């Protein structure tokens, strides 16, 4: 494995550990999820470019679409929770009812 792949895997691992450790605030969780999605995007792009696998060249774009949808839903949930309760604690999400 080259140094670039090791750095990307380290970025993914740090984001995953951050997601597992700092779960109290919704904003911290969303930032860690974005870091994970960014490292997955870079890893998929580099893997496809290095292997010349042209059939899967759309996969990073699809991953970016899912990341954008996840970010939009997460931010809308963050705005709704912070307007309702005044804080962005994840424990307030258990109180939400449809």
Swiss-Prot record:
Q: Which GO terms describe its biological process?
A: ATP synthesis coupled electron transport
Enzyme kind, highest EC tier = translocase
**Where is it located?**
Mitochondrion inner membrane
Q: Which Gene Ontology terms of cellular component type are present? A: mitochondrial inner membrane; respiratory chain complex I
What keyword terms does UniProt attach to this protein? Electron transport, Membrane, Mitochondrion, Mitochondrion inner membrane, NAD, Respiratory chain, Translocase, Transmembrane, Transmembrane helix, Transport, Ubiquinone
* UniProt EC number: 7.1.1.2
Catalysis: reaction(s): a ubiquinone + NADH + 5 H(+)(in) = a ubiquinol + NAD(+) + 4 H(+)(out)
- Membrane topology classification: Multi-pass membrane protein
Q: Where would you say this protein principally sits, based on its record?
A: mitochondrion
Q: Which Pfam families match?
A: Oxidored_q2
Which ranges does the record mark as transmembrane?
1-21, 29-49, 61-81
GO terms for MF = NADH dehydrogenase (ubiquinone) activity
Q: What does this protein do?
A: Core subunit of the mitochondrial membrane respiratory chain NADH dehydrogenase (Complex I) which catalyzes electron transfer from NADH through the respiratory chain, using ubiquinone as an electron acceptor. Part of the enzyme membrane arm which is embedded in the lipid bilayer and involved in proton translocation.
Q: Share what the entry says about its subunit structure, partners included.
A: Core subunit of respiratory chain NADH dehydrogenase (Complex I) which is composed of 45 different subunits.
Family the UniProt entry places it in: Belongs to the complex I subunit 4L family.
Protein name per its UniProtKB record: NADH-ubiquinone oxidoreductase chain 4L
Question: What is the scientific name of the source organism?
Answer: Hydropotes inermis (Chinese water deer)
